[in-house]
Amino acid sequence: MNQQDLKNAVEKRRTFAIISHPDAGKTTITEQLLLFGGVVREAGTVKARKSGNYAKSDWMEIEKKRGISVTSSVMQFDYAGKRINILDTPGHEDFSEDTYRTLMAVDSAVMVIDSAKGIEPQTKKLFQICKMRGIPIFTFMNKLDRDGREPLDLVNELEEVLGVEAYPMNWPIGMGKGLAGLYDIYNNRIELHTDEPEFLELNADGELKESNPIEEESVFQDAMMEVSLMKEAGNQFDEAKIATGELTPVFFGSALTNFGVKTFLDAYLQYAPAPTSHKDEAGEEIEPTEEEFSGFVFKIQANMNPNHRDRIAFLRICSGEFDRGMDVTLNRTGKTLRLSNSTQFMADTRENVETAVAGDIIGLYDTGNFQIGDTIYAGKHAIQFEKLPQFTPELFMQVSAKNVMKQKSFHKGIKQLVQEGAVQLYTNYTTGDYILGAVGQLQFEVFQFRMQNEYNSEVVMQPMGKKTARWIDPEQLDEKMSSSRNLLVKDRYGQPLFLFENQFAERWFAGKYPDVKLTAKL
């Protein structure tokens, strides 16, 4: 691929994550987008879950049973001349680590909000991560088919709670059973709420070109008045502010009834960025159109295909072109690897990928070479992208195999699930017992379920409660420092740390050993 072809291919890519609070409709809107891409023939619904027709992006057994996304799925499709990569992030708050890493691999985000509830805690947390990265955020106010909060309240809340300017691209004409349509500010038309797509044209003043019965409805008159108010007193549309994440375009609609979703997708593709540069550890920007291939591993997933017990490393391509069978260097080890087995995803289905370019997400079959955060490159110049953030756990549990005769599957399961970041592993410095660390309780439940379901290994979990993890320099360590209030353990890399039972125990330790330096992260 020559330089111009590479540039054209990269320009067509749109790679984004969908973020939301649980039950805001994230999976449903993902389904509708896949429908437009021709990937699925019908979108799943909440009711369909009970009949066994699960959402396409929820592939893991526990996700199907509980109706929550606990891993980040990757889906790719073509639409309107663009190659779209969607990363469907975990909606449950316990999976912030996986979500955070996923948000490092995208160029923009779509924030789905339940219009009956407004901004919820998980939405706020995920928004702040996107804002910190300075990536564009597009807002979809979902569930317009149900009665919800006043649209003006929702837009005001965006600005006041999240501290971002908002610009409505369309406006509801009624809601719930009284939903008559959408005033499409972006396309200067009315989108009627009918079984088949139907539009009414507006003149330059934003009024109907031809008379229509909808004019007599009070919801239409209210919408016209609110739109007029926003045009006078609201924010101005500003592409530059969208690009930096300072202004979020707001779309109203219903993912469940597929109303307003296509309008959103078309506008998103026009204003969302193509792949952007990534910084290496030296602070140098690696441009996506650079000829030399590079990328980083942001996720590892074991057992995506239970029949093969495989392990996939998810790679965000940052520059250049990927060709199957190419040789690359793994920066962490300096080892040369041949990328012969590569794949692209549609939840649990996949196909071999021959070529891909910057912006694409591909899966590499992994026999144990990769770790989360690894950089690979194909050029002569070594590249190491900025490290992905690690979260320090607050909840801990001691874990052991229920059946001592199944130690092999127990150890294999723990090794693989820890490598993919499902939980963090520690070892008691004295006894060698395994201790798991997690951000939230659900991570332990998922771990226990997957150990039994995927590795046929029942585990015994003993709660240790909340702890504060603090690392210590090995040269300052004395094993006598350990006590019941500050348990000495090793992390998976062999580095020593203490698990303090509370802040009082930590202060007591600091008073007794004033010269010992403790750190919150390795």
UniProtKB/Swiss-Prot annotation:
<keyword id="KW-0963">Cytoplasm</keyword>
<dbReference type="Pfam" id="PF22042">
    <property type="entry name" value="EF-G_D2"/>
</dbReference>
<dbReference type="GO" id="GO:0006449">
    <property type="term" value="P:regulation of translational termination"/>
</dbReference>
<feature type="binding site">
    <location>
        <begin position="88"/>
        <end position="92"/>
    </location>
    <ligand>
        <name>GTP</name>
    </ligand>
</feature>
<feature type="binding site">
    <location>
        <begin position="142"/>
        <end position="145"/>
    </location>
    <ligand>
        <name>GTP</name>
    </ligand>
</feature>
<feature type="domain" description="tr-type G">
    <location>
        <begin position="11"/>
        <end position="276"/>
    </location>
</feature>
<dbReference type="InterPro" id="IPR005225">
    <property type="entry name" value="Small_GTP-bd"/>
</dbReference>
<dbReference type="InterPro" id="IPR031157">
    <property type="entry name" value="G_TR_CS"/>
</dbReference>
<dbReference type="InterPro" id="IPR004548">
    <property type="entry name" value="PrfC"/>
</dbReference>
<keyword id="KW-0648">Protein biosynthesis</keyword>
<dbReference type="GO" id="GO:0003924">
    <property type="term" value="F:GTPase activity"/>
</dbReference>
<dbReference type="GO" id="GO:0005525">
    <property type="term" value="F:GTP binding"/>
</dbReference>
<dbReference type="InterPro" id="IPR053905">
    <property type="entry name" value="EF-G-like_DII"/>
</dbReference>
<dbReference type="InterPro" id="IPR027417">
    <property type="entry name" value="P-loop_NTPase"/>
</dbReference>
<dbReference type="InterPro" id="IPR000795">
    <property type="entry name" value="T_Tr_GTP-bd_dom"/>
</dbReference>
<dbReference type="InterPro" id="IPR041732">
    <property type="entry name" value="RF3_GTP-bd"/>
</dbReference>
<dbReference type="Pfam" id="PF00009">
    <property type="entry name" value="GTP_EFTU"/>
</dbReference>
<protein>
    <recommendedName>
        <fullName>Peptide chain release factor 3</fullName>
    </recommendedName>
</protein>
<dbReference type="InterPro" id="IPR035647">
    <property type="entry name" value="EFG_III/V"/>
</dbReference>
<feature type="binding site">
    <location>
        <begin position="20"/>
        <end position="27"/>
    </location>
    <ligand>
        <name>GTP</name>
    </ligand>
</feature>
<keyword id="KW-0342">GTP-binding</keyword>
<dbReference type="GO" id="GO:0016150">
    <property type="term" value="F:translation release factor activity, codon nonspecific"/>
</dbReference>
<dbReference type="InterPro" id="IPR009000">
    <property type="entry name" value="Transl_B-barrel_sf"/>
</dbReference>
<dbReference type="GO" id="GO:0016149">
    <property type="term" value="F:translation release factor activity, codon specific"/>
</dbReference>
<comment type="function">
    <text>Increases the formation of ribosomal termination complexes and stimulates activities of RF-1 and RF-2. It binds guanine nucleotides and has strong preference for UGA stop codons. It may interact directly with the ribosome. The stimulation of RF-1 and RF-2 is significantly reduced by GTP and GDP, but not by GMP.</text>
</comment>
<comment type="similarity">
    <text>Belongs to the TRAFAC class translation factor GTPase superfamily. Classic translation factor GTPase family. PrfC subfamily.</text>
</comment>
<keyword id="KW-0547">Nucleotide-binding</keyword>
<dbReference type="GO" id="GO:0005829">
    <property type="term" value="C:cytosol"/>
</dbReference>
<dbReference type="Pfam" id="PF16658">
    <property type="entry name" value="RF3_C"/>
</dbReference>
<dbReference type="InterPro" id="IPR032090">
    <property type="entry name" value="RF3_C"/>
</dbReference>
<dbReference type="InterPro" id="IPR038467">
    <property type="entry name" value="RF3_dom_3_sf"/>
</dbReference>
